[in-house]
Amino acid sequence: KYKNNIDIISQAKDIIDSLTIGGSKSNYLKKDMEALIPLGTKVYDVSLSDSILKINFSKEFYNVSERLEEKVVEALVYSLTNLNDVKGIMIFVEGSQMQELIHSKRRVPLVLTKDYGINKIYDITSLSNVTKSTLYYYTNIDNDYGVVPVTIFSNDDINKVEVIIETLKSSPI
């Protein structure tokens, strides 16, 4: 357990730095992982209130490629909500809350939680009765072990256990 919010904020800043290209801690990432936050991005402020971590980035945060824009958000959400007492995050850029992805214009929740998903796979035919399952794949790359989460969205009538079994049979990892 953390002594206070300062400990959580300090750890959050370290995580953000490790996820930033050229960040002083980006070398802490495992060799099969890469920093995603654009080079030159600054963190103006990090605060924690009611288990919601608020991060205010510089405008360089939006210099992300369209291919990676959602991955950056997913990486931040997944990494920061693993901290004790952090249930969600809010992303601000130059003081304005991010409401949509910069390139695709896809709207994002104002408070991002693990429900946002990570490494998403969509197997849906409509927007009704959509369920979400997150699988954690244990991987070994050059004797470096890690866990890779993959969120599957589905609206099949089969139950979650069957979705998980079918997904594991055709594992992307």
Give residue spans per PLM region.
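Bimodal "functional hotspot" detector
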Residues: K1-I173
